[in-house]
């Protein structure tokens, strides 16, 4: 058994607790780490250790997040918990904490509340693929019919945001009782059941290396006698010498062939996710490629100009704008390696957006950018970051 502790061969999955304030997210996080540490090794974290989350800066945005980790029978989990609602908004929009799945905590005594709804909407917008529900504070509810009612409400709410409400697993328990060590169905057993459910319901994420090849172009050189080289860090997948690739974004998509891959001045057979490489392109002229385009496996990514976005606008304290912006606002949108000007349409009924707000916008870019739903971007004015966003839905 002692050997088990040092096994780091388990697959790694990122999760987080979401839900309304005071419904017990942090208590649940503490309970999971405590109970899993006893079973599989690792460090138990107390409520106040998690609650005093350190401030981090992600793209200039101040976010308080607690990171804990624990093992289950088959996995290693990294788990994020945020102290305040604003921290969740910022975390999910910037992608500072990518979640392969979320644990939605709902108090059985109160049922779904405004932030429950908002966190489900955010999960949908930023592409959190799976949600598991923990109905907390079950020790405070004597009436089984009330539990059923709350469960139905939660399922309806999830369905209304396009999650499979009828099929989502709901575990009923009391994080507090579990933390106190009570070995009842709503105590320790409920936490064990929750983690087993995460193991079975949240699929293992596709590793970057297994996704299609994508390289955001940072620089372009021409090497006399050899042709044009583009450089950048491979975001996903693998490119092999001799393979056909597409240059996507800003201009019309063009096909070319990778005739060489170089890293640290050495020639390689392939470039893999995470590598900083130079890729030699056959027959492509220096002025046909530019920073801000991507090199990609043919047919896997398309250029778009119009999309719905979920956006967080930096507060004045974070170095953002001091004044609101209105419909027709035209900042720069920074995607991967470059800025593109775009125009913002506010939702009907929204007159203006204040610093510190989060909002859904429709963005129309002045040049097409290679994108998929879930792509993060920054909003800038003259090189200064004033917001962060994520592509929620592509329109055209």
Swiss-Prot record:
Catalyses which reaction(s): GTP + H2O = GDP + phosphate + H(+)
Stretches the record annotates as G3: 81-84
Keyword GTP-binding on entry: yes
Start and end residues of each stretch annotated as G5: 174-176
Keywords: Cytoplasm, Elongation factor, GTP-binding, Hydrolase, Magnesium, Metal-binding, Nucleotide-binding, Protein biosynthesis
UniProt superkingdom: Bacteria
Stretches the record annotates as G4: 136-139
InterPro entries assigned to the protein according to its UniProt record, in alphabetical order: EF-Tu_GTP-bd (IPR041709), EF-Tu_GTPase (IPR050055), EFTu-like_2 (IPR004161), EFTU_2 (IPR033720), G_TR_CS (IPR031157), P-loop_NTPase (IPR027417), Small_GTP-bd (IPR005225), T_Tr_GTP-bd_dom (IPR000795)
One function term, GO molecular function aspect: GTP binding
Protein localization: Cytoplasm
Listed EC numbers: 3.6.5.3
Region: G1, residue numbers: 19-26
Residues noted as binding GTP in the record, renumbered to the chain: 19-26, 81-85, 136-139
Entry GO terms, CC: cytosol
Gene3D superfamilies: P-loop containing nucleotide triphosphate hydrolases, Translation factors
Binding of Mg(2+), residues: 26
Chain intervals for the UniProt region annotation (G2): 60-64
Major subcellular location class: cytoplasm
tr-type G domain segment(s): 10-206
Annotated family: Belongs to the TRAFAC class translation factor GTPase superfamily. Classic translation factor GTPase family. EF-Tu/EF-1A subfamily.
Biological role: GTP hydrolase that promotes the GTP-dependent binding of aminoacyl-tRNA to the A-site of ribosomes during protein biosynthesis.
Subunit structure: Monomer.
NCBIfam families: EF-Tu, PRK00049.1, PRK12735.1, PRK12736.1, small_GTP
Protein name: Elongation factor Tu
Source organism per UniProt: Legionella pneumophila (strain Lens)
Gene: tuf1
């Amino acid at each position: 058994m002692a050997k088990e502790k040092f096994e780091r061969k388990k697959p790694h999955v990122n999760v987080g607790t979401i839900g309304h304030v005071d419904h017990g997210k942090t208590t649940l996080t503490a309970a999971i780490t405590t109970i899993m540490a006893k079973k599989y090794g690792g460090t138990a974290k107390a409520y106040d250790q998690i609650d005093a989350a350190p401030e981090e800066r992600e793209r200039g945005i101040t976010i308080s997040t607690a990171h804990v980790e624990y093992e289950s029978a088959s996995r290693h989990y990294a788990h994020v918990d945020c102290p305040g609602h604003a921290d969740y908004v910022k975390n999910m929009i910037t992608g500072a904490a990518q979640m392969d799945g979320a644990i939605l905590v709902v108090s059985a005594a109160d049922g779904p509340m405004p932030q429950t709804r908002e966190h489900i909407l955010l999960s949908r917008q930023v592409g959190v693929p799976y949600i598991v529900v923990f109905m907390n504070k079950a020790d405070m509810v004597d009436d089984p019919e009330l539990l059923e009612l709350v469960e139905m409400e939660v399922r309806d709410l999830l369905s209304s945001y396009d999650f499979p409400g009828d099929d989502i697993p709901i575990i009923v328990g009391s994080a507090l009782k579990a933390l106190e060590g009570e070995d009842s169905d709503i105590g320790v057993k409920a936490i064990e059941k929750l983690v087993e459910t995460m193991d079975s319901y949240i699929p293992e994420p596709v590793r970057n290396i297994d996704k299609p090849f994508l390289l955001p172009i940072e620089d372009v050189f021409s090497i006399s006698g050899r042709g044009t080289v583009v450089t950048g860090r491979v975001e996903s997948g693998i490119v092999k010498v001799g393979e056909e690739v597409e240059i996507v974004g800003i201009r019309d998509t063009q096909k070319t062939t990778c005739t060489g891959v170089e890293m640290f001045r050495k020639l390689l057979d392939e470039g893999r996710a995470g590598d900083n490489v130079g890729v030699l392109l056959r027959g492509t002229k220096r002025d046909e490629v530019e920073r801000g385009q991507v090199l990609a496996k043919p047919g896997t990514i398309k250029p778009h100009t119009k999309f719905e976005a979920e956006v967080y606008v930096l507060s004045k304290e974070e170095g953002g704008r001091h004044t609101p912006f209105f419909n027709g606002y035209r900042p720069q949108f920074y995607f991967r390696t470059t800025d593109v000007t775009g125009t913002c349409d506010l939702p009907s009924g929204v007159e203006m957006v204040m610093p510190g707000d989060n909002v859904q916008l429709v963005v129309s870019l002045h040049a097409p950018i290679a994108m998929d739903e879930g792509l993060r971007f920054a909003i800038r004015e003259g090189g200064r970051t004033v917001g962060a966003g994520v592509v929620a839905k592509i329109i055209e």
